[in-house]
Design a protein with these regions (language model features):
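Structured, charged N-terminal subsegments at the starts of enzyme catalytic cores
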Residues: 1-43
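Extended C-terminal regions of large enzymes
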Residues: 9-17, 169-186
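Short Gly/Pro-enriched turn/cap motifs at secondary-structure boundaries
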Residues: 10-13, 93-97, 155-161, 246-250
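Alpha-helical support elements that line or immediately flank enzyme active sites
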Residues: 27, 181-203
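Internal maturation/activation junctions in enzymes
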Residues: 29-120, 132-133, 140, 247
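Extended C-terminal subregions enriched in glycine
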Residues: 40, 110, 158, 191, ...
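Short Pro/Gly-enriched beta-strand edge/turn motifs at strand-loop
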Residues: 84-92, 145-154, 239-242
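Active-site rim segments in enzyme catalytic domains, especially the processed small/beta chain
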Residues: 112-177, 201, 205
Length: 281
């Protein structure tokens, strides 16, 4: 639960838990301004922590060494939150026990809503096609680890950590709407930014998708879209983040949202970075 909204993601073995862990860390902070170094720094640090925990613990649930309940507990979120300082830190996992994706969403007048995502991974998936049918098989095994001590090590009849995560928001048991951001490991980062844009900064769905994004690429390295204030970028660099501003916006995900307001009016928004469309009939 994030500030009165329930954020729904697919459970492990997918990484839908990653944005939920980041939101669980962030809910202990108060945000007033989106484009400030303090806000972005806290979001970026929480995202790094969540990715580190996802890499450490998420795999086929039968093999996980930490439970979803522990990873999303208030106690663990608070412990991780206390690790955030005024400086950029190398990501590390905690101890809770102590591109070619397609997304669509739809809604009708009867209140039915669908959040849907599909991807074969790595463009054409495995490159193996069912003879005579042209159906390409997926390549999700790419994310298995070959380290025999890693929780996500490849094994027979085991499902790997994967990246496809359609999202959904509810409030007080009522559907608010589906959302999603395509883009491999950008997906949980996009989910985090879209959810906070809407809930913390009161953006409408289109504004939430239009806003400049950042992406963690490893270590202390972040890519940012043009449009982020230069002084904010400089402040983040002074805090220890390695920031690169890119003109190419194609790597920052592609999203769609449907939002139902308190009067029951539906609003659809589509990604300005791609060829999506919001259609009503």
């Amino acid at each position: 639960n994030y500030r009165g909204y329930d954020v729904w993601e697919l459970p492990p073995n997918g990484h839908g838990i990653v944005p939920l862990m980041a939101l669980n860390i962030l809910k202990g902070f108060d945000f007033t301004t989106r484009e400030s170094a303090e806000t972005l720094h806290r979001q970026m640090e929480a995202m790094k922590m969540a990715f580190a925990d996802g890499d450490r613990y998420v795999t086929d649930p039968k093999y996980m060494k930490a439970s979803v309940a522990d990873l999303l507990s208030d106690r663990y979120g608070e412990a991780r939150r206390r690790e955030i300082t005024g400086r950029a830190l190398q990501p590390h996992y905690g101890d809770p026990n102590c591109g070619g994706t397609v997304y669509l969403c739809t809604a009708d007048e009867e209140g039915n809503m669908v959040s849907y995502i599909q991807s074969n991974y790595c463009h054409f998936g495995s490159g193996v096609v069912l003879p005579g049918y042209g159906i390409a098989f997926q390549n999700r095994g790419y994310n298995f680890s070959l380290d025999e001590h890693h929780v996500n090590c490849i094994a027979p009849h085991k499902r790997t950590y994967h990246t496809i995560i359609p999202g959904f928001l509810t409030r007080e048991g009522r559907a608010v709407g589906p959302f999603g951001v395509m883009g491999g490991f950008m997906q949980p980062q996009g989910h985090l930014q879209v959810v906070t844009n809407v809930i913390d900064f009161h953006m409408n769905p289109q504004e939430a998708l239009d806003a400049p994004r950042w992406q963690w690429t490893g270590g202390l390295h972040f890519d940012m879209e043009p449009g982020m204030p230069l002084q904010v970028v400089e402040q983040l660099q002074n805090m220890g983040h390695d920031i690169r501003v890119l003109e190419d916006m194609s790597q920052f995900g592609r999203g769609e949202i449907i939002w139902r307001n308190e009067e029951g009016v539906l609003a659809g928004a589509t990604e300005p970075r791609a060829d999506g469309v919001a259609a009503a009939w």
